A protein has these predicted regions:
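Hydrophobic, aromatic-rich transmembrane alpha-helices
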Residues: 1, 70-83, 409-435, 441, ...
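Interfacial juxtamembrane loops and adjacent helix segments
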Residues: 114-173, 177-230
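Perimembrane helix-loop-helix junctions
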Residues: 89, 292-309, 325-358, 430-432
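Short acidic/glycine- and proline-prone juxtamembrane loop motifs at membrane-interface regions
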Residues: 272, 276-284, 461
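Membrane-interface helix-loop-helix junctions at transmembrane boundaries of multi-pass membrane enzymes
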Residues: 9, 83-90, 303, 342-350, ...
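Membrane-interface alpha helices of multi-pass inner-membrane proteins
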Residues: 268-275, 306-322, 328-333
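Transmembrane-helix motifs of polytopic, lipid-linked glycan transferases
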Residues: 71-79, 206-214, 230-254, 288-290
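Membrane-lumen/periplasm interface segments of specific transmembrane helices
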Residues: 21-38, 330, 334-425
């Protein structure tokens, strides 16, 4: 896809983005409007007491400097990526190094950003989020495992539990992958004193403070659990920021290096990632985006092995959460679209489909034969139990109000500037007349639109749709293609300012203090 001549964003779009961003900040900080649907679900605001105003100010300055440095790295890298004079081998090596540097800066920036928040809301919340059943529950269940067979039996019993309250919570609505992943992390810390000691030596003071409040029988949790909780936090954060790599590769299939860099850089400034770390939802974008990149690359450039690998990664994702079902729908939609446009003939489509089916079916069959786990039955039960969640009287939901709220919530969670770029890119793609450009636009719009209208996520869309948010970076690429350097810098500044306003005010969890 050939980029257009560098130009600025339309004045009307700039006015809309700035106005919407300022309005968002005003509503969050100067009003007490409910962040959700009253009486059903809403997000809590982070309170900045008058007695702690000075600490809040210092935290805001730290967050601002951190986001400024991340934005500067994104801007500087964009200039370097635009250079084409280096020899090819050196150029590829330099770009790979820059991309790894972007991930490293994102990881460090996320740490500093979370450290800037008040106690109980930033980095110190991580052990509470991962340990307590109310906010997660996967680790809590994993630490009770005495053997894999016992876990299998208890897990299958919960799926069919007659008590709907127990059946519709984490254990009954999720496949066993997350529980087993936390078990693996805990076992690594239990069996290796070196790993345990190294992880504990990296713990910030606020994390140690928070862990000291987690009591079992009046005693603090043992070092094994303290290390496992912090290691799981670090791995989740690294996985979240590393999503920039598959975003870069996905955009690079059809766009120049600089555009791919810009799209990847924007991922580090998505507010939802910082708000919901270290929830498991932050793990999903890496797997989901890598799968889409491999599938789209196989469609555009060929390679059956890519389709097999993409399906295998999606299978891993489905073992973690049914949230990966839209990824399958998107991949199928892309293949069908390109076939209909004559860019992916029937023979190629058949081979791609068989390769994808093999990547999904073979590990499913292997689990059934070796572990006696019928994943198809488990996924079906998870789906039914999740649907039953909204039938419980303590979880009332109204369909129509959530349609509007979810749109607003998604725009703020992604970041108003990025959401505006995605909308602009969507319109450009739809009007381009190029099947390769219009395909991702139509399929992303169709899959997300059906998910939105289905009402499957009435509440917490900002968290539950995290694995779909890289699509905004992908769609925005069509606008980023022609964005001149000055406008790119201003856009980064606006996105960073919105992150500062949202992350400093919105809590993704219903607890505070300590």
């Amino acid at each position: 896809m050939t980029p257009n001549r560098p130009s600025g964003l339309p004045v009307a779009l700039w006015i809309a983005l700035v106005t919407a961003s300022v309005t968002t900040a005003v509503v969050l900080w100067l009003t007490d409007w409910t962040l959700g649907v009253p009486g059903e679900w809403s997000w809590e605001r982070i309170v900045h007491p008058a007695a702690s105003r000075w600490d809040s100010l210092l935290g805001g300055l730290q967050a601002g400097l951190t986001l400024g440095c991340v934005g500067l790295a994104a801007w500087f890298g964009s200039r370097l990526m635009a250079r084409q004079s280096q020899p090819r081998a050196l150029s590829q090596l330099a770009r790979a190094a820059l991309l790894l540097g972007l991930v490293a800066s994102g990881f460090l920036g996320m740490q500093l950003l979370l450290h800037s928040l008040p106690p109980g809301h930033g980095i110190g919340r991580s052990p509470w989020v991962l340990y307590y059943p109310g906010s997660s529950g996967y680790y809590y269940e994993a630490r009770k495992v005495t053997s894999l067979e016992d876990f299998r039996q208890s897990y299958l019993e919960v799926l069919e539990d007659p008590d709907p309250h127990r059946r519709t919570l984490h254990l009954g609505t999720h496949p066993p992958g997350l529980f087993l992943a936390h078990l693996a992390v805990r076992e690594a810390c239990r069996r290796s004193a070196a790993v345990r000691d190294l992880v504990l030596s990296w713990q910030p003071y606020r994390v140690r403070q928070a862990q000291a409040t987690i009591l079992e029988g009046g005693r603090p949790i043992p070092p094994v659990d303290a290390a496992a909780l912090w290691l799981a936090t670090l791995l989740t954060q690294l996985t979240a920021v590393a999503t920039a790599i598959p975003i870069y590769l996905l955009v690079r299939v059809d766009h120049p290096y600089r555009t791919a860099w810009r799209a990847a850089s924007l991922w580090l400034l998505v507010p939802a990632v910082a708000i919901f770390l270290p929830k498991s939802d932050c793990l999903y974008p890496l797997l989901a985006t890598t799968s889409i990149w491999l599938w789209w690359s196989a469609i555009r450039k060929g390679g059956h092995s890519k389709a097999v690998l993409a399906a295998g990664l999606t299978w891993i994702g489905l073992c973690l959460s049914l949230a990966f079902l839209p990824i399958l729908a998107l991949a199928a939609g892309l293949a069908a679209w390109m076939n209909r446009q004559g860019r992916f003939n029937r023979k190629q489509l058949t081979a791609w489909s068989l390769a994808s089916l093999a990547g999904l079916a073979l590990p499913t069959l292997a689990c059934w034969l070796t572990l006696d786990l019928n994943l198809l039955s488990i996924w079906s039960s998870n789906f039914v139990n999740h649907a039953a969640f909204y039938d419980q009287p303590q979880h009332p939901r109204s369909y129509l109000p959530w349609l509007g709220v979810n749109l607003l919530e998604l725009a703020i969670a992604v970041g108003i500037p990025l959401a505006g770029l995605a909308a602009s890119g969507l319109l450009r793609r739809l009007g381009s007349g190029q099947p390769e450009a219009a395909g991702p636009a139509w399929t992303c719009l169709a899959v997300w639109g059906l998910l939105w209208l289905s009402g499957k996520n009435m509440g917490e869309a900002a968290r539950l749709w995290l694995l779909l948010m890289p699509w905004a970076c992908w769609l925005a690429a069509s606008t980023l293609d022609s964005l001149r350097s000055r406008d790119w810098a201003l856009l980064l500044a606006l996105q960073a300012a919105l992150v500062l306003a949202v992350v400093g005010r919105v809590s993704g969890f219903d607890f505070a203090g300590g």
